[in-house]
């Protein structure tokens, strides 16, 4: 690393620390020639190849802005959007690839967005997957409904007692609830 003051071709690393968000390394350096200190920040560049073939750096802000449009009018907080942006960036960096396509980034967004808000997920998926007809929306909604049907079945198997309690309270005005018989001294 060249010294920015005297242009000496070498420098010594005095201290290294990761930044708070963990995406870069901050290094404190000292020039062996002029003894002045300076700071460098190293980040791993992550490039996104767009459909047009243009390559640009990955931007968490761009991800959040795109998802924000899908969440317009929905009860989604800015904090939740920031967390989603961080999860997406972590997911795409975890691939280990220096270049990703917009398709890869879109796939990384769909999972966390589905967990965040189903309506926003449908809005985003309709653009990302280029829905052309009502059948495309109906198929996506049917997929979400099927997933919701399967999810309580898994939860009930894991938490049978909680499911029994829920079953008794969710029946509404016409349902009956079994009351356990108290134990007697003879038991």
UniProtKB/Swiss-Prot annotation:
GO biological process: negative regulation of DNA-templated transcription
Domain named ATP-cone: residues: 46-136
Annotated PROSITE patterns: ATP_CONE
Biological role: Negatively regulates transcription of bacterial ribonucleotide reductase nrd genes and operons by binding to NrdR-boxes.
InterPro entries for the chain: ATP-cone_dom, NrdR-like_N, RNR_NrdR-like
Record region (Disordered): 146-187
Domain of life of the organism encoding this protein: Bacteria
A Gene Ontology molecular function term of the record: DNA binding
Keyword vocabulary terms for this entry: ATP-binding, DNA-binding, Metal-binding, Nucleotide-binding, Repressor, Transcription, Transcription regulation, Zinc, Zinc-finger
Species in which this protein is naturally found: Streptomyces avermitilis (strain ATCC 31267 / DSM 46492 / JCM 5070 / NBRC 14893 / NCIMB 12804 / NRRL 8165 / MA-4680)
Cofactor note: Binds 1 zinc ion.
Stated name of the protein: Transcriptional repressor NrdR
UniProt keyword annotation of Cell inner membrane present: no
UniProt xrefs under Pfam families: ATP-cone, Zn_ribbon_NrdR
Sequence similarity: Belongs to the NrdR family.
HAMAP family in the record: NrdR (MF_00440)
Membrane is among the record's keywords: no
Signal peptide residues on this chain, from the entry's feature table: none
Zinc finger (unnamed) residue numbers: 3-34
Needed co-factor(s): Zn(2+)
């Amino acid at each position: 690393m060249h010294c920015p003051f005297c242009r000496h071709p070498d420098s010594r690393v005095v201290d290294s620390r990761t930044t708070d968000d963990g995406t870069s390394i901050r290094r404190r350096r000292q020039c062996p020639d002029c003894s002045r200190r300076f700071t460098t920040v190293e980040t791993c560049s992550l490039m996104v190849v767009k459909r047009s073939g243009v390559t640009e750096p990955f931007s968490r802000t761009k991800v959040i802005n795109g998802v924000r449009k899908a969440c317009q009018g929905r009860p989604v907080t800015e904090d939740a959007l920031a967390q989603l942006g961080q999860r997406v960036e972590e997911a795409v960096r975890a691939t280990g690839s220096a270049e990703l396509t917009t398709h890869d980034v879109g796939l990384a967004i769909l999972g966390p967005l589905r967990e965040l808000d189903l309506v926003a997920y449908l809005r985003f998926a309709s653009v990302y997957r280029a829905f052309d007809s009502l059948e495309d929306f109906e198929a996506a909604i049917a997929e979400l409904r099927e997933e919701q049907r399967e999810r309580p079945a898994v939860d009930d198997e894991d938490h049978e007692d909680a499911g029994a309690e829920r079953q008794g309270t969710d029946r509404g005005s016409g349902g009956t609830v079994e009351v356990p018989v108290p134990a007697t001294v003879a038991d």
